[in-house]
UniProtKB/Swiss-Prot annotation:
The chain crosses the membrane at residues 41-61, 89-109, 113-133, 143-163, 171-191, 203-223, 245-265, 277-297, 318-338, 350-370, 379-399, 416-436, 447-467, 515-535. MFS-type transporter; part of the gene cluster that mediates the biosynthesis of patulin, an acetate-derived tetraketide mycotoxin produced by several fungal species that shows antimicrobial properties against several bacteria. May be involved in the secretion of E-ascladiol to be converted to patulin by the secreted patulin synthase patE. InterPro entries: MFS, MFS_dom, MFS_trans_sf. One of its GO terms (biological process) is patulin biosynthetic process. Keywords: Cell membrane, Membrane, Transmembrane, Transmembrane helix, Transport, Vacuole. Disruption phenotype: Strongly reduces the production of patulin. One of its GO terms (molecular function) is transmembrane transporter activity. It is a multi-pass membrane protein. Induction: Expression is correlated with the production of patulin. Expression is positively regulated by the secondary metabolism regulator laeA. Expression is strongly decreased with increased sucrose concentrations. This decrease is lost in the presence of malic acid. Expression is increased with pH changes from 2.5 to 3.5 in the presence of a limiting concentration of sucrose, 50 mM. Natural phenols present in apple fruits such as chlorogenic acid or the flavonoid epicatechin modulate patulin biosynthesis. Residues 16-29 have a biased composition (Basic and acidic residues). This is MFS-type transporter patC. Residues 1-15 have a biased composition (Polar residues). Its main location: membrane. The lineage of its organism: Eukaryota, Fungi, Dikarya, Ascomycota, Pezizomycotina.
């Protein structure tokens, strides 16, 4: 199905007039080379710019998962165990809420200064997390850092696309996805290292400030000012007014109410509580209102509306969106819950449990690199997607079977299969632009960003709700009549090193661990579902070269 062309929202469209005369045929290779000059930034300056820009992307990936191994010490310091899920969900919530309006903003505001503004937001949120005096403060910091991080990620895509030549763009855009994914899987390792050291978990967040400070001179002095042609001739306030504020408010309310419903249900209050029912109704109403606002362009225009909904009418783009979402959800389940299993069952420290994630990490990185190099040469992306989905499904099913007495080597093997299943999680950033018209590439990238962000947000929220609800109910049934308080039981959910787990008699501790391991297994049901949908969607992809 064809997609009607409309003005691109980001850098790729605005870059075209500067580099390629639109009257020149796209397939005229020699003419295209003449029309596409080399990079304006070269040599050592280009190296420094790449290091600085990609380091921001790495930090964004790290902060997505860095709390996976430090939730227990954070909850212990603040004596807050029922809000553990917010440490991971808060960051992705901020990212998802802001990624759509920021994507529009990058189309009309100076890319350099908007990128710096988002970096500053991220640093401020990280500073609040590091110095947080309470759990509420750290949650606010995580949401704020996530909002800035979304802008950093979009800024990476925009900066790289502006500053590179058309021939270089696929390689550098692929690096953006690879570095982000690498950051995601290294997050638990770095967080665990800080948590187990004298620096404490707070330096997991202060690290961002150090790197931001070191790279700031490069951002300020070596990055050129990059005003967008689409925003020329209009004042700052005129540009602000043209953003889709109706869609932004409805999108924020929709995502926040959905996450509150999922995270609070069964933990802060029961699923049938009136407050939870109210949140469910509000989220449904806001979702319908958002869809209608985008379909009828209420308070905006088709060009300026927040969500590129026309891609949903294209079967291939819709399938890529679904695949992107399934991969993101399964990735976060593995990164968060493999280390948690080893902490509980083997009593591992934060750093040791994260080290046990290395088989998954190594195969993930290796296959992402292999896919990025080989898949464009073969052209038949359906094969790569299908194989990836099969490995993801098999790995998730095997992780579901893990019990208290499963050997570590078996868990490593299962995690490797899941790592192989992540091969194409970033491939849509290359496949999508190859199947849309050139003037829709920027919107395509934004479309994929939305799928990735929403899947991570919902995946983390649902996984946290499953684990906390089932573990709390199971441990309460096991220990509630044996003199242990609800606070003690909640602390056990936070980590294996809780005082309750340490003082339980051996037989009772084994029974408690079986409850916890069973809850972790149930989390993988979501990954199994994602893997199955991944396989089905892959089978429906077009059987042609790209």
């Amino acid at each position: 199905m064809s997609i009607d062309a409309s003005p691109s929202e980001s850098v790729l469209e605005s870059q075209t007039p500067d580099r390629v005369d639109e009257s020149i045929p796209i397939k005229a290779e020699e003419t295209e080379k003449d029309a596409a000059p080399g990079r304006d930034i070269v040599g050592f300056r280009w190296l420094l710019v790449c290091i600085a820009v990609f380091s921001a992307n790495l930090l964004y990936g790290l902060d997505n998962t860095i709390v996976a191994d430090i939730q227990a010490p954070i909850a212990g310091d603040f004596n807050e165990y029922t809000r553990l899920g917010w440490l991971g969900v808060g960051f992705t919530l901020g990212s998802v809420v802001f990624i759509l309006p920021l994507g529009k903003a990058y189309a009309i505001f100076d890319t350099k200064w908007l990128f710096l503004g988002c970096l500053t937001m991220f640093a401020a949120g990280s500073a609040l997390c590091g110095a947080a005096p309470s759990m509420n403060a750290i949650i606010v910091g995580r949401v704020w850092a996530g909002a800035g991080g979304a802008g950093m990620y979009l800024g990476n895509l925009n900066l790289i696309t502006i500053l590179t030549t058309p021939k270089e763009q696929p390689v550098y855009v692929g690096l953006v996805g690879l570095i982000y994914g690498t950051g995601c899987i290294l997050g638990p390792i770095i967080g665990g290292a800080f948590s187990d050291s004298s620096a404490t978990w707070r330096w997991s967040f202060y690290l961002n400030l150090v790197i931001f400070g070191v790279m700031s001179p490069i951002y300020v002095f070596l990055l050129p000012s990059l005003p967008r042609p689409a925003g020329e001739g209009r004042s700052f306030f005129k540009k602000l007014v043209e953003l889709d504020w109706v869609g932004t408010v409805l999108s924020a309310g929709m995502h926040i109410s959905i996450i509150l419903f999922i995270v609070f249900g069964g933990v802060e209050w029961s699923w049938t509580d009136g407050r939870n029912i109210a949140l469910y109704v509000v989220s449904a109403v806001l979702t319908i209102a958002f869809v209608l606002s985008q379909y009828f362009c209420i308070g905006t225009t088709k060009q300026d509306r927040l969500f590129p909904g026309e891609f949903l009418r294209d079967p291939t783009m819709l399938l890529l969106y679904i695949i992107m979402a399934c991969g993101g959800a399964a990735l976060f389940v593995a990164v968060y819950y493999i280390p948690l299993y080893f902490q509980f069952v083997h009593g591992d420290s934060g750093i040791m449990s994260a080290v046990r994630l290395l088989p998954f990490v190594c195969f993930y990185v290796a296959t992402i690199l292999l896919c990025g190099y080989v898949m464009p040469k073969t052209g038949y992306f359906i094969i790569w997607y299908l194989m990836s989905g099969v490995f993801m499904l098999i790995g998730a099913v095997l992780m579901y079977t893990v019990k208290l007495d499963t050997s570590p080597s078996n868990v490593y093997g299962y995690s490797i299969l899941m790592g192989l299943g992540m091969t194409t999680t970033q491939a849509a950033y290359a496949v999508g632009p190859a199947i849309v018209t050139p003037d829709r590439v920027a919107e395509c990238l934004q479309f994929m960003n939305i799928g990735q962000g929403q899947s991570q947000l919902l995946g983390l929220a649902i996984a946290s709700a499953i684990f906390q609800t089932k573990t709390l109910s199971g441990l309460t049934a096991l220990l509630g009549d044996k003199g242990y308080s609800q606070v003690d039981i909640q602390s056990a959910v936070a980590g294996a090193q809780s005082t309750l787990m340490e003082r339980l008699p051996p037989a009772l501790k084994t029974a408690a661990l079986k409850v916890i391991v069973s809850s972790i297994s149930d989390v993988y049901v979501m990954a199994i579902s994602a893997g199955a949908l991944y396989v089905v969607a892959s089978c429906l992809l077009p059987r042609r070269r790209f």
